[in-house]
Amino acid sequence: VSDTAISISDLGYFYRPDVWVLRHCEARVARGGVFAILGPNGRGKTTLLHLLIGASKPREGSLAVRGRIAFVPQLFEASFDYTALDMALMGRARKIGLFSQPSRADVEATLSALDRFGMADFAERPFGELSGGQRQLVIFARALVAEADILVLDEPTSALDLENQALVLERIAALAREDGLTVVMTTHQPHHALAVADDALLMRGEGDYLAGKARDILTEESLRSLYRAPLKRLAFEHEGVEVETIAPILTPTRRANIRSQTATKAEGAA
């Protein structure tokens, strides 16, 4: 069995021929690893996810996926009044079949998945009554019970409060380390990527990118260039464990500049 889950070779994609979102992109996603995709808005992160799940086709190059994919979008709405358990059970649709009822084993597996994301107590709650963050956790559980080999997550912590961000990041790490799943995630949070990712891809726009080991490429220099904001990479010990993280630096001068820019935009809009 290959130790590579996804191979990206000379990959290119454009929406119009003179503006490439991706160009000559080379990357490898290791089986059982976490792969983070970072970049400002509009740099092609979602486009790359669409290529990975087969919703779009490359303009050039190739992309080889070895295994079944479960996709968790950034936002998810339900058209009918399903419970949280019903929504999560839909992940078992391929196993259950079109006209069959879920077995006891299906329900137990789904409740277990909900429990892993802290949502077992909400199993009978209507999905539409859950908060945005709670709905996202249910969809994570749905992806888990699909028994896919690769989870593709579009900004998995964007709708979550701080407690549930930590929960989801812990679960992402556990799904890779303990369950052997491959996880591909987009994120706007470099510290999240540094915490859980083995490898990363920085999308800098117009086909420019940087790929490699997360610890090697998530540097102050590369991230300052990417986000045009001052950042500091920090290392410290917490409960006997060495921790590395990345924090934005918001100085009094920068705060004043942001307030000034905001006021100028407001005046222009008026």
Describe each PLM feature range:
Residues 53:
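Helix-to-loop junction immediately C-terminal to a conserved catalytic motif
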Residues 126-130, 134:
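Conserved ABC ATPase signature
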Residues 38-40:
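The feature captures the beta-strand-to-loop junction immediately N-terminal to the Walker
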Residues 200-213:
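H-loop (His-switch) and adjacent beta-strand-loop-beta switch element
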Residues 226-270:
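ABC ATPase nucleotide-binding domains
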Residues 151-155:
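Catalytic Walker B motif of ABC-type/P-loop ATPase nucleotide-binding domains
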